[in-house]
C-alpha cells in the first residue's frame, strides 16, 4: 500500500506541473485554466456521487467516488495556491479536540453581526 503522504505529494506535483500544460492535452490543465465555477461544479457533482454511493451502501463505489472527490478538491486547492499540507496541518490541529469544542471555538471567534440600518 502506498503511503498517503507520498500519493498526495505526487498528485500535487502533477497538478502543479499541469498549470503550464496545454489545456487541449491535459484534463487537469483544462480545469485549471477554466473559470472556477467549472471546478466547483465538478466538486459538487463528485460529492453528490459519493453521497449516492453511500446511500447505496456500495463500498467500491464509495471508494471510487471519494477518490474522484478528493482529486478534484486537490485541483481546487491548487487554484488557490493551498497545499495539501495546509489541510493536513489543520486536521492535525483539530486532532484530539471534540467536535463540539472545536465548533464552539469557531463561534466565539466570529465577529458579532452588525444590525442592518
UniProtKB/Swiss-Prot annotation:
Name of the protein described by the UniProt record: Phosphoribosyl-ATP pyrophosphatase
A Gene Ontology term for the protein's cellular component: cytoplasm
Cellular location(s): Cytoplasm
GO molecular function: ATP binding; phosphoribosyl-ATP diphosphatase activity
Species: Nitrosomonas eutropha (strain DSM 101675 / C91 / Nm57)
Gene: hisE
SUPFAM superfamilies per the UniProt record, alphabetical: all-alpha NTP pyrophosphatases
Main location: cytoplasm
The keyword ATP-binding is annotated on this UniProt entry: yes
This enzyme's EC code(s): 3.6.1.31
Catalyses which reaction(s): 1-(5-phospho-beta-D-ribosyl)-ATP + H2O = 1-(5-phospho-beta-D-ribosyl)-5'-AMP + diphosphate + H(+)
BP terms from Gene Ontology: L-histidine biosynthetic process
Organism domain of life: Bacteria
Biased composition (Basic and acidic residues): 96-105
Amino acid at each position: 500500500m502506498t503511503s498517503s503522504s507520498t500519493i498526495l505529494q505526487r498528485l500535487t506535483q502533477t497538478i502543479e506541473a499541469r498549470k503550464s500544460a496545454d489545456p487541449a492535452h491535459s484534463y487537469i490543465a483544462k480545469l485549471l485554466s477554466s473559470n472556477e465555477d467549472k471546478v466547483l461544479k465538478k466538486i459538487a457533482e463528485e460529492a453528490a456521487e459519493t453521497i449516492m454511493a453511500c446511500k447505496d451502501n456500495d463500498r467500491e463505489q464509495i471508494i471510487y467516488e471519494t477518490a474522484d472527490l478528493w482529486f478534484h478538491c486537490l485541483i481546487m486547492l491548487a487554484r488557490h495556491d493551498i497545499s495539501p499540507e495546509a489541510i493536513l496541518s489543520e486536521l492535525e490541529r483539530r486532532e484530539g479536540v471534540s467536535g463540539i469544542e472545536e465548533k464552539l471555538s469557531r463561534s466565539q471567534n466570529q465577529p458579532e453581526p452588525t444590525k442592518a440600518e
